C-alpha cells in the first residue's frame, strides 16, 4: 500500500464491484468510493454495494441522479434506505438523461427537499464542471454552471451538512486552474 499513501477516491458500479473480491485488499482503509447509479440499476443493488463497502472499511458515496427519480417520495425512500445501512454521504447530480423520469431534474431540487437533514447525512457533494458542460451551458461560458453553484453555495449556509464539489478527471490543468480562480472570485466555497 506504499504507493497509495495519498488521499484519493474511486468510482464503481454495482456490477463492476461484484468483480472485486475484497476492496480492503486493494484500497486503503476509509477510501471514498463513489457508486454510479445508472438508470437501469436497481436501488437494492446500490444499497447492497454500500453495505459491502462499509463492511470492507470503505466510505460509500452513492450517486443520486435527479432525472431518474419518479418523484420526491422515491427520493426519500432512497435517502432513508441508504441512511438505514449507515450511509452518511452522497453525490447529487442532475443526471445524464435529457428527459427526466418525473418532476425532479436538478440537484438543487434534491437539496431543497430537506430529506438529507431529516436522515442525518453529514456530507453532500455536487457536480463541478471545470471544462464546462454542454448540457448546462450551451455557450462556452460557464454562466449557468456558476449560477447553480452559487445557489448551492447559499444553501450550504443554511444547513449543518457539509457541501463539496466533485469533478470528473480532467486531462488539461489550465481549465481547472481557471475554474478554481473563478470559484474564488465568485466566493463559492464548497
Feature-to-residue mapping (PLM):
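Active-site beta->alpha loop and helix N-cap motifs at the rims of alpha/beta catalytic domains
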Residues: 1-147, 154
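Short helix-capping segments at alpha-helix termini
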Residues: 56, 117-119, 158-160, 184-189
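Hydrophobic, aromatic-enriched interface-forming segments
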Residues: 139-186
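Short hydrophobic/aromatic-enriched beta-strand-loop microsegments
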Residues: 33, 189-190
